[in-house]
């Protein structure tokens, strides 16, 4: 997204202690994404202005690459409805099953049904709103939950 709110949230996240996990869409050539168990944070937005058709084609290609290269994560966080739909299609998920969402404004949670990441829990929200720390706080909360379980 080129939206200022989303850009600021990515900047805060990638300036944090999680910066080593921040990838741009051009970094999706790794042999395997996510092999070290640390969060992998992938900003799929293009640095160029794109038409709607170009953006859709790029997102399709990016999500197919993620489906092909990424190790199945313990949990998934996706921002943006178009991104979630494209990723579900790339992974072969045929539906989402509602789960209990985090206690955060605008965030939802569902389990992927079908496909190569069947059963994976996904926290999601639409793009372009929230505080500048929203991404960082969500990732930090999920990490804390995994450490305590």
State where each predicted segment sits.
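Active-site catalytic microenvironments in core metabolic enzymes, especially phosphate/sugar-handling
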Residues: 1-149
